Each structure stands twice: as C-alpha cells, then as structure tokens.
Amino acid sequence: MVGHDYRLPRITSAMLVLTHGCNLECRYCFVQQNPCHMTFETAMRATNFLIQNADRENLVPSINFFGGEPMLMWDEIIVPLTNWIRNEYQKPFSLSITTNGTLLNKEQIEFLTQNRIGVLLSIDGDKETQDYNRPLHNGGSSFDILKDVIPLIVEYRPGTTFRMTTIPKTCEHVFENIQFAQESGFKSFFVIPNVFEKWSDEKRGILAKEMRKYSDYYIESFRDGVEPIRFSEIDKGFVAIRQINSAIDAKEYRTSNKCKSYGKCGLGASRFASIDPNGNLYACQEMTSNEGEQSIFYIGNIFDGERDDLRYRLMNLYDSSQASGEDCSSCKLNRVCDGGCVANNYMITGSVNKLPEMYCWWQRLLLDEAIYIMQTLGTEENDMFRKRWVNVV
C-alpha cells in the first residue's frame, strides 16, 4: 500500500496525442480510430502545463508527438508548436515523434533534424510484411510510400530506431525484416510480438527460431569485429543475467525496482503521462482512446491539474507481490520480473497484476537468447563483446 506521505512527482513529460485518426489500418493497433483532433490551443495549454511543472521540479520538459498518426497534424500543431518552443520559449525542451513515416518528405525530415526532434519509426519490415501488417485504409501499399522515405530518414536521422511489431501470420519473416532494416541503413531495431493475439505453439516455435537466427548473426558479427544492428532487449537481457545472479547470491526475490509501483510505467506514479486531444491526462498512451474519463488510468487534466487521489488509487491497485503469469515458480525471471506492462495486463487479463502468458513467454525467450550469446562469446573470450558487456551492465 502506497500512502499519501509518498510525494508524487509533477508530470513533466508527456505523449501528446494529437489525433485519434490515422492514414493506416494496422491489424494490431490499440487506438480506437476516430476523427478526434487536438486544437493548437489545447497543445499550447499542455505545453505550458509541462513547462510549469518542470520549472517547479527543476527539470527539462519533454513531449513526444503521438497519435493515431501525429503527422496528420503537421501544419496545425507540430510546426507552430515547435517554432514557439524553439524560437520563443528558447529553453531546453526535449521533443520527439512516433510516426509511421508515410506522410514524411524531405522538407519535413529536415525540419525535424533542424529542430532536434527525435524520431521513432513504426515499420514492420519489407514490402510483404509491411503491406500485410500495416495497409492503407483502402488496402493499398504503405511500403510503396515508405521505400522513398526510408533513405531520407537514414540520411538525416541515422539514430532512428526501426520499430517492428510481429504477428503470427508474418512471424516467419522476422529475421528477414531485421536484415532489411540493417541493409536499409538502420543501426538499431526493436521488435515485440502482438500480445493481444493468440499465438499457437507452432507460431511461437517459428518466432523462437527467428530470434535464434538473430543471435547467431549477432555472434558472427562480433567474431568478425563488425557491429551488428542492435536490439536493446538483448542488452536488457545481459543486465537481467547479472541481476539474477546477484539476487541468487543475496537470496533476494524480485530485486528490480520496477516492481515498486512508484517507479513503474503506466501507474501514474512517475513524471510521465499521456495527454489526449481534449487535454485529459492518462497514465498510459494505450488508454487515451479506449475508456475515456471512466478509465482507472485517467489521472486528471491539464486545465485543473493532476488528480493525485486518482494516481494513488491506481498505484495501490498494483501489488508486485501478486503480479504473476502462468508459471512464475519455475520462471528464470521470477527474481527480477518487472510485472509486465500494466495497461496490457489490464486490457488482456482484466487485472494490472496478471500478466499475459505471451508476454512471459517472450521475456523468457529474450533472456535465453542473451544467455546463449553471452555463453558463446564469453567462452571464446571475444574482446569486442567483453567491452560491450562492461558498457551495458
């Protein structure tokens, strides 16, 4: 139980949901698409809300332009708000955007670069995978648009992450799509299975083989002295190995600080929130278009401020001692489990404390791949890998 004597931090960082609309119709999207757009006035109020809180906390405010597809609001919000922040506010302010990339052109990418706006590109792979997973509303090809955008992103924004979601129908192409990302010039990727979909044992086996292909490629790259395209979850796996060993030595259980509600994403307990087009505050961006103000993830609005009573209520719904999956007792991660994504837990299982079985399976797979890589390259005393290990853990 988290008491009111715990001081909740002011919200200084936000996913600014500019619209619930999108030009794509992705098969797995959590957004309930509708023509609800944020006004520039609301965007300014949200920005000043974050600035005022950041000033009180002596921190740098930050915004991630989010959607739907935020590029639909390029002229209405992104350009004028960015110009105000960079040219009139003129103090440090972190800006980024999560986009499907299909509405980007050279001029816009140059604007993002000049104004130091970070980019996370949501793209699932080559033409076959991208067009199946992420078609246009009319069923047309989104890849045919992106093929001309990708070289511009790589040229102007070389640090952009290639962010993939995989589904059972296309999971046999995961490693091909990782290779596509690398060959296109990306230095890092992120992939996650759609946990809202049913995964058969056969499809899980295929996905596991795809990730082993990546691990083998990773190992061969280090043997050749070449930097592989990076997957941050593998680095997290290296950290988990150290945490698990430390927890075993100390006879501790669930040592990860992420198990504490006041340090966990999605519980309204941090400096982060999502702001919907109407100015409402939510603990997670996945909930802004799903349940409205009746949601347990609703925590106030930018006009009246955060509702700390609602934040405490949400925090106290989460209990790391109860957070569980299908078979925790034999799970390699049971000492350092972070309790999963509370929003996904809630939407799939009905409880913030109950993890989807597919999430657990995926986390165990990633740990197994990290162990496989570590044991192989560690046994070979690969110096390049040793330096990576030291830097990561």
PLM segments and residue spans:
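Radical SAM enzyme core and accessory elements
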Residues: 1, 278, 289-292, 322-393
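Canonical Radical SAM [4Fe-4S] cluster-binding loop centered on the CxxxCxxC motif
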Residues: 6-42
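Short glycine-enriched, charge-decorated loop/helix-capping segments at active-site entrances
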Residues: 32-36, 132-140, 348
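Radical SAM/AdoMet-radical enzyme domain recognition
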Residues: 47-66, 73-201
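C-terminal accessory region of radical SAM enzymes
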Residues: 210-253, 286-332
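Short, small/polar residue-rich loop motifs at catalytic or cofactor-binding pockets
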Residues: 265-269
